[in-house]
């Protein structure tokens, strides 16, 4: 099988005639399941990216979020709290035995979260298929996101098992070293993998990993993503979990992968690493900037909403458009 592959930095979208007077007229709203959200983005469900207070802020302000699964006991109180406040509840599960019992416990307590994400590194597996079916049996109203995957076969199989959306991306993230440790993954061709998977999908796809700029969010939408999961761009904020250190008068915050020893607390099956990211200030400011950039993109696409982006032409430029200049 030969597949023409490319990644984010290899692609440029081609503008269409602008039909709005101001980019502020452009609507970045996206629908996922029964809810509409302000933007097609979701912070990665990683310990150094999302925490309860960030989740509450996002839910209150109309953004999608997925709470991480690394504090299992906190999930039921969290769902109760979100439901009490009438905000969306969105959590993650793994596939181990205790997670099966956890799903049954949610059902027993009559606590159906709005969204559950089954979150494992290699999502094309029987354990994920069984977990999808278990959630659909016990919590039929819950929207199930399953991943991560990197092939059309995987997307079809998880959709057929009952997944309402699939998450595409194996190891393209900044703190993911799966591609180095195992030789497998979508690192270096994530955008082409997304396109390949989206062509097979009948349900929404969440692009996960490899997003380095706001323009990459737009490229993901062009190639079939409904939602775009973002780690490193959301790391390093005032509100982020994780340690802060000062070096030569500059503040940095830690950011580590979900399969790193820092998250696991042990050196076993390590496929993530830790990096220090320069402190970025307030998360609110980053969200505002992202929103404005998305509005600009819609105006370049010649439309008024995200749909316009899906139809634009593109070119594949096999040289990096940034020439190594980080924004």
Swiss-Prot record:
GO biological process: purine nucleotide metabolic process
GO function terms (MF aspect): GMP reductase activity
UniProt keywords, alphabetically: NADP, Oxidoreductase
Enzyme class: oxidoreductase
UniProt-annotated catalytic positions: 176
Signal peptide limits: none
Residues that hold NADP(+) according to the record: 205-228
Record Gene3D superfamilies: Aldolase class I (3.20.20.70)
Database matches in SMART domains: IMPDH
One GO term describing the cellular component: GMP reductase complex
EC number(s) on file: 1.7.1.7
Catalytic reactions on record: IMP + NH4(+) + NADP(+) = GMP + NADPH + 2 H(+)
Protein family per UniProt: Belongs to the IMPDH/GMPR family. GuaC type 2 subfamily.
Function according to Swiss-Prot or TrEMBL: Catalyzes the irreversible NADPH-dependent deamination of GMP to IMP. It functions in the conversion of nucleobase, nucleoside and nucleotide derivatives of G to A nucleotides, and in maintaining the intracellular balance of A and G nucleotides.
Name by which UniProt lists this protein: GMP reductase
Organism, as annotated: Helicobacter pylori (strain ATCC 700392 / 26695) (Campylobacter pylori)
